[in-house]
Each structure stands twice: as structure tokens, then as C-alpha cells.
Amino acid sequence: MKKSILAFAISAIFLTACKKEEVTPTPTGSGPVSIYFEHLFGSSTFNLGQNYITGNNDTMNFSLFNYFVSNFELVKADGGVYTYPVDSSYFLVKESIDSSRTITLKNVPAGEYVGVRLIIGVDSLRNTMPLTSRTGILDPSTGAAGMYWSWNTGYIFLKSEGTCSSSPSMMGMSKMFQHHVGLYGGLNSPTINNVKKINLTFPGTYKAIVGNALAPEIHTKVDISKMYNNVDFSKYSMVMVHPYSATLANNYATMFEVEHVHND
């Protein structure tokens, strides 16, 4: 009996020692980080051509919804920050193109990340660079076609179009709305600055673990209904270079929230 008890005790000590030695390996190398933008209107999946009811009891139907995201920074678990190379950090998200709602940051250094910072729009420096420095998705004639004001020399940060039940009919078009939000503070004369930097902290204990062949995806909810909280379409159905664009920009800066993180 005593021998059995002794053998059991030795086995328990051995197993405990083994468990203590099981340490999660430190991530090494580098890898991709993907960010998926899930478009919603309140609790409903967002789709072009579908009716949605706002908090003001307006019925909205969208024909277009596009926006730029840029200038990404990843916040490390130890408080450090990795700044993604700026020249590669511009992306155009279009509701009409499913693949555009997933963006990938390449060659991110290994580590554990607990948050992401980004700009909704295009920063003032890039807005004022020579066209030769604005290629790819920022080329006004190709990648950024329809998202650039040639007459105002600046990018449209977010473009939303469609119909709304409380919009007035004008120019032969019934109940139409067009919200084109841009303006970066101005070059030769001051303007409104609608460049919005947002800080998204991962909920709970979620971390994006980069390295060791892992490719995390940050699942981000984008609730478009928040952009239209308390918007009076009878007054502001057409907003472009207008002071009210600041209200729309402040609203859409609240649309984004990280729901969870996959580490695959």
C-alpha cells in the first residue's frame, strides 16, 4: 500500500514538472495581418439596394458606399507601436466589391498585438504631394477614380449615395442624397479638417499573434447607421464642401469596432 502511494506521488510530481515546462513559444519572423470590415446597418447586414430605417424613422436605400482607410499602426501587448510603411498603407473599401472589405498588412514583425490605429480618409501630407507620388489606389485617374475632387485638389474620404424618404426632390431626382466627405485642412487657405484617426482596442483578452506561420484576421464591425444618427435629410441631403461635412465625419469615426480576432 505504501509503495502504491509513493508511486502515485512521484507520478504526480513528474506530471506537474512536465506541465510547467510547456511554455508557449515566442513568435518569430514576420507575417501578414488581415483586417476584415463587416458592414452593418444597426443589427442588419448592409447591402446596396436594400431599405434601412434610421433612428429618425427615415427610410434609406444606398446605391454606393466607399471610404479610404490608411496610416495603420499596430499596438503591441507591451505598449509599443509598430507603424506600417506609409507608402503601402492606403486602401479603398467599396461595398460593391466584396474583396475590398478585407485588407492585408504584409510583413508585420512577429509579436502580440492588442489594438490597431488608422485614419479614415487620406492624410494631409499625401493630399498635397505631387501626383507622381500618388500612384495605385491613390491615382486620381485610375485607383481613386470617383474618389477625388480635381476642382478642389483633394480626396473624397467617404462617399455615400442613395435615396432617403425625407430628402427633398431636386433637379428632377426624387429623394436623392449625396454625401461626399473630404477636406484635410487646406493647403493655401484653411478648410475644415475631416481627417479622422481612430484607435481600436481589441475586446477582452483577444490578441493578434504574428509569426510562427500564423496569419491573424481582425474582424471589425462597421455600423453605418451611426453615420446617420440625427441627420436631418430635409436640410442636408447634399453635402460636399460644406460645414456640415464635419458632423458626418465625426459620426462615421464612431462606426468602427473590433468584434474579435482569429489567429489561424
Residue ranges and their predicted role:
Residues 5-10:
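Sec-dependent signal peptide hydrophobic core
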